[in-house]
Swiss-Prot record:
The gene is galR. Gene3D superfamilies: 3.40.50.2300, lambda repressor-like DNA-binding domains (1.10.260.40). The keyword Mitochondrion does not apply. Pfam families: LacI (PF00356), Peripla_BP_3 (PF13377). This is HTH-type transcriptional regulator GalR. One of its GO terms (molecular function) is DNA-binding transcription factor activity. Pathway: Carbohydrate metabolism; galactose metabolism [regulation].
Length: 331
């Protein structure tokens, strides 16, 4: 079991300093970096006695989750559901109560709410509205460094590069992209997708970029089906492979290919993104980029908890790695 002495040794400070930091002694004069180092080490070695900001009080503090999509949409998109699940599991471990808001930003929150976790993409106007809540904010699945808030995202750029590299190594000289176009829920901003940028950069670097191989719709099975079915029926040349920016798009595309007598992976290969449970349930099972959505939520909750314990003025961007999981939609 981890002890104060263990933390003190690793942090290079006295046991007394560790104890006073963990007990939030406001009379203690230490640098922000030292305070943060002690709290981080305590987390890493499993010291849990200090875990929440209210451990000396009987009442529980609350954390609000603001989900950018509706509850109905979340049921259809396990990606955002899993992020929320990760937040809730970690919040329970840290002894916080949860409030939920779906596709809605409240005008105010009670004093018992100490922080807000914002899942999804938000416009500048929406972020300004969130800031007016006067709570500690952490964003998940969007880069809000420029707005001055800590955030957790997936390493989209390297994920796409790794998928495209694999297809190129399999002899695919022409690689298409299936992608969705999103707007913020207030419809004021079109969301720039880093996967599109990464795809373009890679293909241009390799001299294989062809804008005709990019098919844009929305992130649904139906859109994936319609995009590829229309492409096939037009008689246009198909690429050797497609990278689909979601499992849903890939599943729709797979059905269109099968209905038109095009074999996967013999005639065309597919790699999808997210690796939800659906990816392994279709035939053939999809090769997919595994995204650790639940861990994104847990990480965001940890960041919020640390901000409440020892606020840092400099915002941080935490990118989680991914893994290319190969199945039968590639050779």
């Amino acid at each position: 079991m981890a002890t104060l002495a263990d933390i003190a040794k690793l942090a290079g400070v006295s046991i007394s300093t560790v104890s006073r930091v963990l007990n939030k002694d406001e009379t203690l004069s230490v640098t922000e970096d030292t305070r943060h180092r002690i709290l981080t080490i305590a987390d890493e070695i499993g010291y849990t006695k200090y875990k929440t900001i209210n451990n000396s009080k009987k009442e529980k503090y609350q954390v609000a989750i603001i989900q950018w999509v509706s509850e109905e949409h979340e049921l259809d998109d396990i990606y955002y559901y899993n992020i929320r699940l990760g937040i809730e599991k970690r919040a329970y471990e840290l002894d916080y109560e949860m409030l939920h808001f779906f596709n809605d930003i409240p005008s105010s929150l009670g004093e018992e709410v100490v922080g807000v976790l914002c899942i999804g993409k938000f416009s500048r106007e929406q972020i300004a509205k969130l800031e007016r809540l006067k709570k500690t904010l952490v964003f998940v699945d969007s880069d809000t460094l420029n707005q001055g808030h800590p955030c957790v995202t997936t390493d989209f750029e390297n994920s796409v590069q790794s998928a495209l590299c694999y297809l190129k190594e399999q002899g695919c000289n022409n690689i298409g992209l299936l992608i969705g176009q999103e707007k913020t829920t207030d419809a004021t901003e079109i969301i720039s997708d880093p996967r599109l940028r990464s795809y373009r950069n890679y293909c241009m670097e390799k001299g294989i970029y062809d804008p005709l191989f990019i098919l844009t719709g929305d992130f649904t099975v139906q859109s994936g089906y319609e995009l590829l079915d229309s492409k096939i029926k037009s008689g246009a040349t198909l690429p050797d492979a497609y990278f689909a920016a979601s499992d849903s798009l890939a599943i729709g595309a797979l059905r269109a290919l099968q209905e038109n007598g095009i074999k996967v992976p013999d005639d065309i290969q597919i790699i999808s993104f997210n690796d939800t449970t659906l990816a392994k349930q279709v035939y053939p099972p999809l090769s997919s980029v595994t995204v650790y959505t639940e861990e994104m939520g847990r990480t965001a909750m940890d960041i919020l908890n640390k901000q409440l314990l020892a606020p840092r003025k400099i915002p941080t961007l935490t990118k989680l790695g991914t893994k290319l999981t190969l199945r039968n939609s590639t050779k």
